[in-house]
Amino acid sequence: MNFNKVFILVAIVIAIFAGQTEAGWLKKIGKKIERVGQHTRDATIQTIAVAQQAANVAATARG
């Protein structure tokens, strides 16, 4: 919950200051956030794959 409040506050501050600035600055920040999201997605997919393999090994070891 606290993260949501901080995120909303940061978004409002960016919106206020970005109102009169060029779009390039905001676009760069958006691309960085998008890249972080992509890395998070990829890491999650890899973690799920490793967990599934570990579960398969554990099931095979049990018989």
From Swiss-Prot:
It comes from the Eukaryota. Keywords: Amidation, Antibiotic, Antimicrobial, Immunity, Innate immunity, Secreted, Signal. The modification Arginine amide is found at R62. One of its GO terms (cellular component) is extracellular space. The keyword Signal applies. PROSITE patterns: CECROPIN. One of its GO terms (biological process) is innate immune response. The keyword S-adenosyl-L-methionine does not apply. InterPro entries: Cecropin, Cecropin_insect. It holds the Pfam family Cecropin. Residues 22-23 form a propeptide. Residues 1-21 form the signal peptide. It is found in: Secreted. Its main location: secreted. Belongs to the cecropin family. This is Cecropin-1. It comes from Ceratitis capitata (Mediterranean fruit fly).
